From Swiss-Prot:
<dbReference type="GO" id="GO:0010597">
    <property type="term" value="P:green leaf volatile biosynthetic process"/>
</dbReference>
<dbReference type="GO" id="GO:0000287">
    <property type="term" value="F:magnesium ion binding"/>
</dbReference>
<dbReference type="GO" id="GO:0016102">
    <property type="term" value="P:diterpenoid biosynthetic process"/>
</dbReference>
<dbReference type="GO" id="GO:0010333">
    <property type="term" value="F:terpene synthase activity"/>
</dbReference>
<feature type="binding site">
    <location>
        <position position="382"/>
    </location>
    <ligand>
        <name>Mg(2+) 2</name>
    </ligand>
</feature>
<dbReference type="InterPro" id="IPR050148">
    <property type="entry name" value="Terpene_synthase-like"/>
</dbReference>
<dbReference type="InterPro" id="IPR001906">
    <property type="entry name" value="Terpene_synth_N"/>
</dbReference>
<comment type="function">
    <text>Monoterpene synthase (TPS) involved in the biosynthesis of monoterpene natural products included in conifer oleoresin secretions and volatile emissions; these compounds contribute to biotic and abiotic stress defense against herbivores and pathogens.</text>
</comment>
<dbReference type="InterPro" id="IPR008930">
    <property type="entry name" value="Terpenoid_cyclase/PrenylTrfase"/>
</dbReference>
<dbReference type="GO" id="GO:0009507">
    <property type="term" value="C:chloroplast"/>
</dbReference>
<feature type="binding site">
    <location>
        <position position="382"/>
    </location>
    <ligand>
        <name>Mg(2+) 1</name>
    </ligand>
</feature>
<feature type="binding site">
    <location>
        <position position="530"/>
    </location>
    <ligand>
        <name>Mg(2+) 3</name>
    </ligand>
</feature>
<keyword id="KW-0456">Lyase</keyword>
<protein>
    <recommendedName>
        <fullName>Monoterpene synthase like 1, chloroplastic</fullName>
        <ecNumber>4.2.3.-</ecNumber>
    </recommendedName>
</protein>
<feature type="binding site">
    <location>
        <position position="378"/>
    </location>
    <ligand>
        <name>Mg(2+) 1</name>
    </ligand>
</feature>
<dbReference type="InterPro" id="IPR036965">
    <property type="entry name" value="Terpene_synth_N_sf"/>
</dbReference>
<dbReference type="Pfam" id="PF03936">
    <property type="entry name" value="Terpene_synth_C"/>
</dbReference>
Length: 627
């Protein structure tokens, strides 16, 4: 039966009594970059509501004569046939055995570096190997070799940087920039002041007039390094501005080649929207087209073959996981929820692009399921449900008992059970990985999340516009970042004891910043479409009310500056030295932020997933790399 075909009126006598797990409000701490709230009266109704509601809004009248709004989203792009008929031969034993042999051969290449590389190139060669195995997506096999190589490089690091080799007389920008980018990501403390030594007498970066390939690559690595900036590092901002301008001008001069494509990819995706598996797919093409690399010794041939094979072998794992996800989607009754977006395959793809180690199946599937649930709830609270129905649903979730569905309208019953069953199942998976029961902890997160939705539903129903600060504090919770990350993260083979979890999850600054980025970036991409659907409240509208006379362009500029600053703070939270939390424990939450950020890079890629998001699915999930 279609879940929205029967919508009986809610009985006034039915009351879902509940006891929340915690009396705490779980209010996120104030965000450090909120604007000054002006001392002016707040309008209770939006002055733009009448005009925005007159725009195209999809509505339907249910069987109980309730007028309901829907988003008019496009349908699911990946039906059962697309998934079920995926075929790949790369799951066969012969390919895996070939991969194991290649791994051993690449290990031999790492080992031979100390013998083959001269003292005038030993540093850059080690950095080259580390950088390439990471960009090709095969670094998980060489953790010990990478550490040994970086230990060696760091032992020669100075306040002025490094040269190409240990016997080099002068420091080298390419070696220093590549080292400066790579070392912090592995926990080695280095100062941005090292880049000051590559400026001229008046404190400006300068380019070499010869513009050789090495000069250009120096600028590529300087730009890549500049993106891992911390707050207050002016030299990093200068390096980014200078190298970005240089590379854009270079693209206009050089012919189409592997180097030009590499520059284009780096400028297009940077770091914070360059998902590791997506980067690997793009870099495989760049690496394979580089004639200089292919004329080199066996290093490049082995690296490239292993990267291609690993990429395709993982697709055989993805096929099995997609079949499992499709069964869950059907069994949960999702196809009958016709008012919502169905983007479970897209969410799975994002998870696969940030965690493609085979053992992290639980994370990938959990993330896709959690995000699908969040999307259903988002559309139900923002559009389809009435305020009274949503109050009943929120109360029923806090009871956490299937009998609570007796109080709910018919269309909500299946949604409730999808949430209930999936959260319980993910908690069981997390208990296996973490060795303790985390269900109550997860329930608290979902309760707070729905409370934030309930607040927004009331704002929409009344037309009330909150202050910017009020909206952002609630919006960081309703962004869904925390509940999308928490349980999938706990299924991984990374220990998250309570003292570590509190530094990664709520109430940590890492969590607060990640949620802020998702809310701010999401609003800059979605506010016009949301307003057309009658959802007036956004960071943009609240900023404009707080600042009379400000235009939408002013608001967008302000938010973009905020986002840039928050990204730098997030970099610091991930990489700050002397942290009690390993980078590996923080990295998955950081990478989830990158995944969401990618989805909003060009547009709302979750509502309109038929362009860039579809391309991501095709390129990383469905299309193998030609060997």
């Amino acid at each position: 039966m279609d879940l929205i075909s029967v919508l009986p009126s809610t009985s006034k006598s039915c009351v879902c009594m509940h006891k929340p797990l915690s009396s705490s409000t779980h209010k996120l701490k104030p965000f450090c970059r909120t604007i000054r709230i002006l001392g002016m009266p707040r309008p209770r109704k939006s002055v733009l509501m009448a005009s925005s509601m007159s725009m195209s809004v999809n509505t339907l009248v249910s069987d109980d004569d309730i007028q309901r709004r829907t988003g008019g989203y496009h349908s699911n792009l990946w039906n059962d046939d697309v998934i079920q008929f995926l075929s790949t031969p790369y799951g066969e034993l012969a390919y895996r055995e070939r991969g194991e042999r290649l791994i051993d051969e690449v290990r031999d290449i790492f080992s031979s570096m100390s013998l083959e590389d001269g003292e005038f190139s030993d540093l850059i060669q080690r950095l080259w190997m580390v950088d390439n195995v990471e960009r090709l997506g095969i670094d998980r096999h060489f953790k010990n070799e990478i550490k040994s190589a970086l230990d060696y490089v760091y032992s020669y690091w100075s306040e002025k940087g490094i040269g190409c080799g240990t016997k080099s007389i002068i420091t080298n920008l390419n070696s220093t920039a590549l080292g400066f980018r790579t070392l912090p990501l592995h926990g080695y403390p280095v100062s941005a002041d090292v880049l000051k030594h590559f400026r001229n007498q008046i404190g400006q970066f300068v380019s070499c007039p010869s513009e050789t390939e090495e000069d250009i690559r120096s600028m590529v690595n300087l730009y890549r390094a500049s993106l891992i900036a911390f707050p207050g590092e002016e030299v990093m901002e200068e390096a980014e501005s200078f190298s970005e301008k240089y590379l854009k001008e270079t693209l206009q001069k050089i012919p189409d080649c592997s180097l030009s494509r590499e520059i284009g990819d780096v400028l297009e995706h940077g770091w914070h929207t360059n998902l590791p598996r997506f980067e690997a797919r793009n870099y495989i093409d760049v690496f394979g087209q580089d004639t200089k690399n292919m004329e080199s010794n066996r290093k490049t041939e082995k690296l490239l073959e292993l990267a291609k094979l690993e990429f395709n072998i993982f697709q055989s794992i993805q096929k099995t996981e997609l079949e499992s996800l499709l069964r869950w989607w059907n069994d949960s009754g999702s196809p009958q929820i016709t008012f919502t977006r169905h983007r479970h395959v897209e969410y799975y793809t994002l998870a696969s692009c940030i965690a493609f180690e085979p053992q992290h199946s639980g994370f990938r599937l959990g993330f896709a399921k959690a995000c699908h649930i969040i999307t259903v709830l988002d559309d139900m609270y923002d559009l389809f449900g009435t305020v009274e129905e949503l109050k009943l649903f929120t109360a029923a979730i806090k009871r956490w008992d299937p009998s609570a569905t007796d109080c709910l309208p018919q269309y909500m019953k299946g949604i409730y059970m999808m949430v209930y069953n999936t959260v319980n199942e993910m908690s069981a998976e997390a208990q296996k990985a973490q060795g303790r029961d985390t269900l109550n902890y997860a329930r608290q997160a979902w309760e707070v999340y729905l409370d934030s939705y309930m607040q927004e539903a009331k704002w929409i129903a009344t037309g009330y516009l909150p202050t910017f600060e009020e909206y952002l504090e609630n919006g960081k919770v309703s962004s869904g970042h925390r509940v999308s990350a928490l349980q999938p993260m706990l299924t991984m083979d990374i220990p998250f004891p309570p003292h570590i979890l509190k530094e990664v999850d709520f109430p940590s600054n890492l969590n607060d910043l990640a949620c802020a980025i998702l809310r701010l970036r999401g609003d800059t991409r979605c506010y016009q479409e949301d307003r057309a659907r009658g959802e007036e409240t956004s960071c943009i509208s609240c900023y404009m009310i707080d600042n009379p006379g400000a235009t939408e362009e002013d608001a967008l500029n302000h938010l973009n500056v905020m986002i840039s600053g928050v990204i730098k703070e997030l970099n610091w939270e991930l990489l700050k030295p002397d942290s009690s939390v390993p980078i590996s424990s923080k990295k998955i939450n950081f990478d989830i932020t990158r995944a969401f950020h990618y989805g909003y890079k060009y547009r709302d890629g979750y509502s309109v997933s038929s362009v860039e998001t579809k391309s991501l699915v095709m390129r990383t999930l469905l299309e193998p790399v030609p060997l």
